[in-house]
């Protein structure tokens, strides 16, 4: 059997299991109301939590950045591609998200995946031990694999088991890595307990705040600020393509850690820098996030979250206890989840079906992503369609 035959059989297996993914094509800007595949829909699929992806100030800043710096960076950060826009943004990010450190410095990456790979692989070598939450994002998992370190996976948010594993560990370098807001459940890691364990056992805590940055904490400064945590043993990864509404990611840590990443993080060194216009737009986004408008958007999002939590409890399915913009509704089988997704789609609602391997088998779910761009009328429309789909599935 040749490779094409093998791949075709694999695709057929995915079809049979209800696991093949299908892309939809957006014909308009990311917003609550969009044109997708030629249809007008209300989208509950994006991670645009503050509704900034089409914000006029960010769009104008993007255009201004392109006029000033051009359309591309022209090279990697270490070989000619590092612009004044990148440098300015890194200084701003260190000040905005680095309150946990006495000497914070930031490093900008093109994607969150690359930032997580860098943070894990550059800090943990083959003689280290990494302790990873069982529900961590794939990018953290891939980072642990590429690091060649010993990896201990602890049950989700189980600090007792983690403590026992740390107690038994003899490695000189120990890293605890965790999402802050877990992307498919919406719950928040016990960060204060994790940091206490890290400091007790001489470990470092690496947190991926992809779904918390811009939303959690005072002025949206993130999960560490929300928990009022400070320590020199923290490494913070934030994403700029979700609540910030643009693209890219960053790592904030003690200045020595960041200098090490510049010298040794392969996902930073061996890739072309993001266009400076992107960094220029992120700088504009930070001003919105930290200002009165950002506060108003977070307050509206919080009200939407509470309304949605009440709605999900009225269905026949199993909501996850989430107080974040990620509101999952566990249905179970792939087939039933796809049927519910199609029922919502028939009402002009885009709510994605999340299936294995993204979530464990038997826990396929609808993942409702809320945005400050949504209105209560949008939620009322979701309520009508979701309750009808729930009744029809009974």
Swiss-Prot record:
Enzyme Commission no: 2.3.1.47
Positions of substrate binding: 21, 137, 358
Residues with the N6-(pyridoxal phosphate)lysine modification: 242
Catalytic activity, reaction form: 6-carboxyhexanoyl-[ACP] + L-alanine + H(+) = (8S)-8-amino-7-oxononanoate + holo-[ACP] + CO2
GO MF annotations in UniProt: 8-amino-7-oxononanoate synthase activity; pyridoxal phosphate binding
UniProt-listed Pfam families: Aminotran_1_2
Pathway in which this enzyme or protein is active: Cofactor biosynthesis; biotin biosynthesis
Cofactors, names only: pyridoxal 5'-phosphate
Organism superkingdom: Bacteria
Residues binding pyridoxal 5'-phosphate: 112-113, 183, 211, 239
GO annotation terms (biological process): biotin biosynthetic process
Subunit: Homodimer.
Similarity annotation: Belongs to the class-II pyridoxal-phosphate-dependent aminotransferase family. BioF subfamily.
Function: Catalyzes the decarboxylative condensation of pimeloyl-[acyl-carrier protein] and L-alanine to produce 8-amino-7-oxononanoate (AON), [acyl-carrier protein], and carbon dioxide.
Protein name per the record: 8-amino-7-oxononanoate synthase
């Amino acid at each position: 059997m040749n490779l094409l035959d093998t791949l075709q059989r694999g695709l057929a297996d995915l079809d049979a299991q209800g696991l093949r993914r299908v892309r939809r094509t957006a014909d308009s800007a990311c917003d609550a109301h969009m044109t997708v595949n030629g249809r007008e829909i209300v989208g509950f699929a994006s991670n645009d939590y503050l509704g900034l992806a089409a914000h006029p100030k960010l769009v104008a800043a993007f255009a201004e950045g392109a006029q000033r710096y051009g359309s591309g960076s022209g090279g990697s950060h270490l070989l000619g591609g590092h612009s004044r826009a990148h440098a300015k943004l890194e200084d701003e990010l260190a000040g905005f998200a680095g309150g946990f450190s006495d000497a914070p410095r930031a490093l900008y990456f093109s994607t969150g995946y690359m930032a997580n790979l860098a943070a894990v692989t550059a800090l943990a070598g083959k003689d280290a031990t990494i302790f990873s939450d069982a529900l961590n994002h794939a990018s953290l998992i891939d980072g642990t694999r590429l690091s060649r370190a010993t990896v201990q996976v602890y049950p989700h948010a189980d600090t007792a088991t983690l403590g026992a594993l740390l107690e038994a560990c003899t490695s000189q370098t120990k890293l605890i890595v965790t999402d802050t807001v877990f992307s498919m459940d919406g719950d928040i890691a016990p960060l204060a307990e994790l940091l206490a364990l890290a400091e007790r056992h001489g470990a470092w805590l690496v947190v991926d705040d992809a779904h918390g940055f811009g939303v959690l904490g005072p002025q949206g400064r993130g999960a560490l600020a929300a928990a009022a945590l400070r320590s020199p043993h923290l490494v913070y990864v934030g994403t700029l393509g979700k609540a910030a509404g643009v693209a890219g990611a960053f790592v904030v840590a003690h200045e020595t850690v960041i200098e090490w990443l510049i010298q040794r993080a392969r996902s930073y060194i061996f890739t072309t820098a993001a266009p400076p216009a992107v960094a220029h737009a992120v700088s504009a986004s930070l001003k919105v996030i930290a200002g009165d408008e950002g506060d108003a958007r977070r307050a509206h999002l919080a009200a939407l979250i509470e309304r949605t939590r009440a709605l999900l409890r009225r269905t026949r399915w199993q909501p996850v206890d989430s107080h974040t913009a990620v509101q999952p509704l566990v249905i179970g089988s792939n087939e039933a989840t796809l049927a519910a997704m199609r029922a919502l789609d028939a009402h002009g609602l885009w709510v994605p079906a999340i299936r294995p391997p993204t979530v464990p088998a038997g826990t396929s779910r609808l993942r409702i992503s809320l945005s400050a761009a949504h209105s209560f009328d949008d939620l009322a429309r979701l309520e009508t369609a979701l309750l009808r789909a729930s009744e029809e599935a009974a």
